[in-house]
Amino acid sequence: MRNCDIKFVNKEITPFGGLSLFFKMLEKCHFEEHVMQSGVPLQGSNRGYKPIQLILGLFAGVWCGASCFGHLDVVRYDAALCDLLGWERGADHRAYQRYLNKFSQAVNQRVFGNLFRCFFSELKFDNYTLDFDSTVMVREGSQEGAAKGYNPKRPGRLSHHPLLAFVSDVRMIANYWLRPGNTSASTNYLSFLEDTLSKLEGKRVGLVRMDSGFFAKEILDYLEMKGLHYIIACRFNNRIKYSLTHERKWIELTDGLEISETIYQANGWEKPRRIVMVRQEIDKRPKAAGKQIKQLELFEDEEDFGKYRYSCFVTDLDLPAKIVYDSYRGRADSENRIKELKNDFSIDDFVTNNFWATEACGNFIVMAYNFMSLFRHALINSNKKKFLKTIRYELISTPAYLGKTKDKHILYLARSLKTRQSFLSIWEKLKDFSLPYDTEKS
């Protein structure tokens, strides 16, 4: 490093000038108008921050890399960014928590039902694949709803256990419900499924995919009653294990991977259903997904089933078994969405002592995710869908300051000559961007 002194300048400069692109898109989406029409709680005092400022401040903080409420002060102390957004001052991080405490279960249902319905009604896609999953969010304190439950990575620790629904075709999240940590994957599943479909009203579901946590008679009956095609991973009870280990008509798809199918009727089912079975030889495919079946007296006549990992799916599709298996494998992308929510958007780190406030914050972060996904679809020219961390480095982290002429404001950006054109191309695209947006164009 050169030997030099330091001096400070009085000009207000933001390190996040690239956020101008995202807030311009939100303007084009009439986001503020939709928020105020959704029934969000209003402030009781004239001195309180407007709800839209707190919601946009949360978006900005998460997009810039905030990983807890305390980090939202990065927006508060960025005077240039606040000026760009037309705010007199930025909100203290405790103002976000106080506002979120106004949300209750009924308010969450009303607000996010309206916002999600409005968002998806402006996107053109149909005959889509809907994925359902749950995840574990570990808690370090004694927040409301934090309890000991299913937690494979940190057994015995308190956690929440939210449900999520994903629109696979557009890489967006259709629904988010927070649940206590001591609930199973199937708790509240029917209500969650109905709520998800209501948020996507007017669009046809082509396929529903679920993991084994949703393997239940009630959900199968509901999907069939609604005429929805499905593939659901089977929970491994003894009858399923027996069917897998006593199957003889295996067809080899590739070395170490075999597939078969049969008709199965569980106790309590009014009718039999088709199940597709897959087994993968561990020695040949050591990273294969599936479960190993341990030796039991019930299966003592079997000698070699322990060398396989098994998967099993119930479906109403009449497609070949291989296509059913390949179709279900695409559900793994929902795991990538969950990882992105946790790693890039820090959804599991924004937690309050109030359960419904935490759920409301999680839903706002999901909305920030969806708008970022829309931005990637509509405005970024790339065959690869870039993660938020990459977008943060390439676009958001752009030093800038706000200037003014006689009749307008000018945002001065500090970008290298090589990267100015890519930034300008997105800015020009924004001028033509409008809703409804056809996702098939991207």
Language-model segment annotations:
Residues 72, 136, 258, 321-355, ...:
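Short amphipathic alpha-helical "interface-anchor" segments enriched in bulky aromatics
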Residues 38-46, 321-328, 344-360, 376-387, ...:
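Short, solvent-exposed helix-loop connector elements
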Residues 201, 220-229:
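Short, surface-exposed basic-aromatic patches at helix termini and helix-loop junctions that form
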Residues 127-131, 173, 205-209, 229-231:
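Structural preference for beta-strand elements that scaffold enzyme active sites
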Residues 2-4, 8, 229-343, 400, ...:
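An anionic, glycine-rich sequence signature occurring as long contiguous blocks
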Residues 208-216, 236-239:
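Acidic, metal-coordinating catalytic cores used for nucleic-acid/nucleotide bond scission
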